[in-house]
Amino acid sequence: MPKIKMIVGLGNIGKEYENTRHNVGEWFIAKIAKDNNENFSLNSKLNCNIAKVNINYNNIILVFPTTFMNNSGLAVSKVANFYKIEPEEILVVHDELDIDSGEIRLKKGGGHGGHNGLRSIHQHLGTNDYLRLRIGIGHPGHKSKVSNYVLSNPSVAQKNDIDNAIDNGICVLDDIINYKLEPAMQRLHTK
């Protein structure tokens, strides 16, 4: 049975993006690092910021690509190759338009659903056989509004909902790391 060794938080690099909906994956790994009193450091060769944490005796590499979202797969594949991590040992945390704010879902494999960060990871890894933690940000209503929506900041109420979803995800992280996916899904997907 595999174990998660790398958690990737998707988002765009730069101050102007750090509080946008598209960066909720980065918010997730930043909270893990903070909870473990660890800081990220830039690894320019691997195109990412990295922090190493120990979660219940499991050594985990937290990765925030320093590429833009559309090229996240470059950093993910470089880190995976460098540390000899298999795709099924990777958890990718990202924003999800098709899930309401405050909801969080765990998924193994599947398509990219139009998410450019996932599309890039699929291309660079050559597979979609990794875990995803999908943090709901809601949908703006029409596809023409999606780009502006994901690149803007959530309202205070929506930010609180997203923060609660992040906390819920962190509460089941030990199960996810140890591939106890059914109990994790049950806790996350049950209201």
UniProtKB/Swiss-Prot annotation:
<comment type="function">
    <text>Hydrolyzes ribosome-free peptidyl-tRNAs (with 1 or more amino acids incorporated), which drop off the ribosome during protein synthesis, or as a result of ribosome stalling.</text>
</comment>
<dbReference type="GO" id="GO:0006515">
    <property type="term" value="P:protein quality control for misfolded or incompletely synthesized proteins"/>
</dbReference>
<comment type="similarity">
    <text>Belongs to the PTH family.</text>
</comment>
<comment type="function">
    <text>Catalyzes the release of premature peptidyl moieties from peptidyl-tRNA molecules trapped in stalled 50S ribosomal subunits, and thus maintains levels of free tRNAs and 50S ribosomes.</text>
</comment>
<feature type="binding site">
    <location>
        <position position="116"/>
    </location>
    <ligand>
        <name>tRNA</name>
    </ligand>
</feature>
<feature type="active site" description="Proton acceptor">
    <location>
        <position position="22"/>
    </location>
</feature>
<keyword id="KW-0820">tRNA-binding</keyword>
<protein>
    <recommendedName>
        <fullName>Peptidyl-tRNA hydrolase</fullName>
        <ecNumber>3.1.1.29</ecNumber>
    </recommendedName>
</protein>
<feature type="site" description="Stabilizes the basic form of H active site to accept a proton">
    <location>
        <position position="95"/>
    </location>
</feature>
<dbReference type="InterPro" id="IPR036416">
    <property type="entry name" value="Pept_tRNA_hydro_sf"/>
</dbReference>
<feature type="binding site">
    <location>
        <position position="17"/>
    </location>
    <ligand>
        <name>tRNA</name>
    </ligand>
</feature>
<dbReference type="InterPro" id="IPR018171">
    <property type="entry name" value="Pept_tRNA_hydro_CS"/>
</dbReference>
<feature type="binding site">
    <location>
        <position position="68"/>
    </location>
    <ligand>
        <name>tRNA</name>
    </ligand>
</feature>
<dbReference type="Pfam" id="PF01195">
    <property type="entry name" value="Pept_tRNA_hydro"/>
</dbReference>
<keyword id="KW-0694">RNA-binding</keyword>
<dbReference type="GO" id="GO:0000049">
    <property type="term" value="F:tRNA binding"/>
</dbReference>
<feature type="site" description="Discriminates between blocked and unblocked aminoacyl-tRNA">
    <location>
        <position position="12"/>
    </location>
</feature>
<dbReference type="GO" id="GO:0005737">
    <property type="term" value="C:cytoplasm"/>
</dbReference>
<comment type="subunit">
    <text>Monomer.</text>
</comment>
<dbReference type="GO" id="GO:0004045">
    <property type="term" value="F:peptidyl-tRNA hydrolase activity"/>
</dbReference>
<keyword id="KW-0378">Hydrolase</keyword>
<dbReference type="GO" id="GO:0072344">
    <property type="term" value="P:rescue of stalled ribosome"/>
</dbReference>
<feature type="binding site">
    <location>
        <position position="70"/>
    </location>
    <ligand>
        <name>tRNA</name>
    </ligand>
</feature>
<keyword id="KW-0963">Cytoplasm</keyword>
<dbReference type="InterPro" id="IPR001328">
    <property type="entry name" value="Pept_tRNA_hydro"/>
</dbReference>
